[in-house]
Structure formats: structure tokens, C-alpha cells
Regions:
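Membrane-interfacial and juxtamembrane segments of integral membrane proteins
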Residues: 2-198
Length: 198
């Protein structure tokens, strides 16, 4: 018997349908589930393929639940921010001092330009190098937290680079005070979790 979800379910992949009728069943209304069940029946999906996809979906769901239960709160995120800001400014100060000592610029415009380059360069380099190499910054070392992808896996270099440049968005630095994941987490599809899990 067809319903308003029949066409939608007929356009789903076998994997999508199996997830819908098994591990994601509670997310859908009964009419959608009925359409998905009928589509699975209609396609005559091989039982071993069905079970394989179902098991994979169960493992993924458990991993996501484990990651979600270990997301750190705003207080820890704020502490990470404070520690990392101190480290970043300390690095920028040291680099500025060394560069100023070596080249000794006299033009105010050049001094300002060099200052901006050092501040932004240090910020970007600090976060990218630390999070690519260790999945964490100094602040996260102190709080025993780390950056992961939404499924708990280690982020790619691209994920970390995206995450770092998204930190430059105005108000991003305080967005984690209002939501569990900040803007840079949302856009880079990452999370900060307690270090004790994958």
C-alpha cells in the first residue's frame, strides 16, 4: 500500500533503507517506516547484505552515542580558550621580539603590518600544528580533552585547517558558551571530547 513516503523511500539507497528500518527506526513516523519496510521487501535485499549493513549501522550508532556522551561543557571549553590565548600571545610576543631584534624596523606602517602578520600567523600555526599533530592544543592537554570528527575518528588535516580558519569568524570564540559545540566545530564537523575515549 502506497503512502506519501513511498516515492521518498524508493529513492533511498539500500544502506539508507536498512538504517531506517533498524537503528534509526525511532526517528521516523510510522507511515515512513511502513514505506521503508515495503521498499526493503520490494528490493529483495540479500539477507547477508542486510545483516552486514545493520551491524555496521549499530556499531556507528554506538560510537556516536559514546562520543556524544563525552562532549565537554562550556566551562572546560572556556578554560581551553584562556590557556590557548595565553600560549598564543606568549608565542607572538617572543616571535615579535626576535623579529624586532633582527630587522629593527623604523616605519610605523611596517611595524604594524609585521605585528598583524605575527599575531595571525602565530594563531593559525599554533592551532593547526598542535591539532594536526596531537589532536589538541596546550589548553586541551591541560584539560585532558581532544578534537575528534563527529563519529569519534581522528580529524583529517583538512578538518583541522577548516576548524582553525573558522575560529577567525567574529563571535566564534564565545559561541561555545551558548551551544555545546562552537561555530568552528559545527563548520568543520568536529567535536571536543574527554580524552578517555577513542
Amino acid at each position: 500500500m502506497e503512502n506519501e513516503f513511498t516515492k521518498v523511500m524508493s529513492e533511498r539507497t539500500n544502506e539508507d533503507l536498512i538504517k531506517i528500518v533498524t537503528v534509526e527506526r525511532e526517528k521516523y513516523n510510522p507511515t515512513a517506516i511502513e514505506a521503508a519496510d515495503l521498499e526493503v521487501e520490494k528490493r529483495k535485499i540479500n539477507i547477508s547484505e542486510f545483516e552486514k549493513i545493520k551491524e555496521k549501522a549499530i556499531v556507528e550508532k554506538k560510537q556516536k552515542q559514546k562520543v556524544d556522551s563525552n562532549i565537554v561543557g562550556s566551562g572546560v571549553r572556556f578554560l581551553n580558550f584562556l590557556i590557548d590565548t595565553i600560549v598564543w600571545f606568549t608565542l607572538a610576543f617572543i616571535i615579535s621580539f626576535l623579529i624586532g631584534f633582527i630587522i629593527q624596523p623604523t616605519d610605523e606602517g611596517i611595524i604594524t603590518l609585521i605585528g598583524y602578520i605575527i599575531i595571525f600567523g602565530t594563531f593559525i600555526a599554533y592551532h593547526i600544528i598542535m591539532e594536526i599533530r596531537f589532536q589538541k592544543t596546550i589548553g586541551k592537554f591541560v584539560t585532558k580533552t581532544k578534537v575528534v570528527k563527529l563519529n569519534g575518528e581522528k580529524p583529517t588535516d583538512g578538518d583541522i585547517t577548516t576548524r582553525t580558519f573558522c575560529r577567525l569568524i567574529p563571535f566564534d570564540r564565545i559561541s561555545f558558551l551558548f551551544v555545546k559545540n562552537g561555530i568552528h566545530d559545527f563548520l568543520s564537523k568536529t567535536k571536543v571530547i574527554k580524552e578517555n575515549i577513542s
